[in-house]
Amino acid sequence: MRTTPSVSLKSVALPTEHGGWGFTLEPLLLALLLSPGPHTLGLFLLGLFGFLARHPLKLAYQDLRRGKRYPRTELALRVGGIYLGFALLGLLLTALTAKGPFLYPLALAFPLGAYMAYMDAQNRSRDLFPEIAAALFMAAFAPAGVLAGGSWANA
């Protein structure tokens, strides 16, 4: 009888790097602190689940690029899809409740995030420039939260 090896959900669902958590959570928590409300809760979900989706989608991409489908590939696609769904719900929540132009900082930082995603797919995310790009991309969530709260109009 042949059995398929089990795959740990934790190894697929949670990224292993420690610094990424700080770069992700600090601007998101700052946005919640500076402009609490559903608009920043949505940005929190977008940023957090976008960060979480990166790891399983990278695993799935690497497997599929090699032309292989392992048990972890299917799990990674499912988990990544769920994370992306929550991220999109966060974006929708922010879009429906924002009182200001929250997309400006995110749009300006988008090329940095795209560069980081590209380098991550090439297994070069730990190089200096991708690390800096990722930190700057995530930092854009703090001003996005303030703008979403309409605080820009009160200045």
Residue ranges and their predicted role:
Residues 1-13:
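Short, Lys/Arg-rich, polar N-terminal cytosolic tail immediately upstream
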Residues 4-7, 54-68, 112-127:
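C-terminal ends of transmembrane helices
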Residues 10-35, 134-141:
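The first (N-terminal) embedded transmembrane alpha-helix
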Residues 16-20, 36-40, 44, 72-77, ...:
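Hydrophobic, aromatic-rich alpha-helical transmembrane segments
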Residues 27, 71-86, 132-147:
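Small-residue-rich segments of transmembrane alpha-helices in multi-pass membrane proteins
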Residues 29-44, 91-104, 140-155:
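Helix-coil boundary and interhelical linker segments in multi-pass alpha-helical membrane proteins
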Residues 40-103:
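Alpha-helical transmembrane segments and their cytosolic membrane-interface
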Residues 88-93, 99-101, 105-145:
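Intramembrane alpha-helical segments
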